[in-house]
Amino acid sequence: MNERQRLWLGSGLVLLQFGLLIVLALLAWPVMENWAITPVAWAAAAGAVLLIGWTLRVNRPGNFNIHPRPRVGGTLVTSGPYGWIRHPMYTALLLGAWALAWTAGNDEVWLAWWALSLVLWAKSTLEERWMLAQHPGYAHYREQTKRFVPWVY
C-alpha cells in the first residue's frame, strides 16, 4: 500500500469511527432519554471522560491528529496515560461507547460497539506504522506498552 492509499484508508477509518459513534448514540438514546443508566455505565462514562482529560493534559492539541497519520514535527509522548497504554484516546472512546452499549443492552448496539472496536484497532495499526517511521524510539515504546488495556492488550 502506498502513502496515498494509506492516507485515504486513514480518512475512511476516521469517517467510520465517527459514524459508528453517532449510530451508538442514536441506538442508545431511547434508554438514555429515560435516565435508565446503570451505575456501571455511569462509572465507565466517567472513566472515559477522565481518561480524555488526562490525555489532553499530557498530549496537548496541536501535537496529535484525529487522522491516524501523526503530525509532522509532533513529539512522541510516553508519560501520563501513554505510560500505561499507547492509544488512550481510543481506549476512552471504547469505554464511553461501551457505556452506551451497556445502557441500551440490545444486539444492534453491541454490534456497533464491536464494529467500532475493529475500526479503532485498524486505525491504531495504521497509526503505528507511521509512528515507527517518524519516531525512532517508538519500536521500544511499543514493546514496553500495551495498545488499549494496561497489562492485557
Where are these regions (language model features)?
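Membrane-anchoring alpha-helices and their flanking helix-loop junctions
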Residues: 1-79, 91-153
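Short, conserved phosphate/pyrophosphate- and ester-handling motifs at nucleotide-, phospho-/glycolipid
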Residues: 87
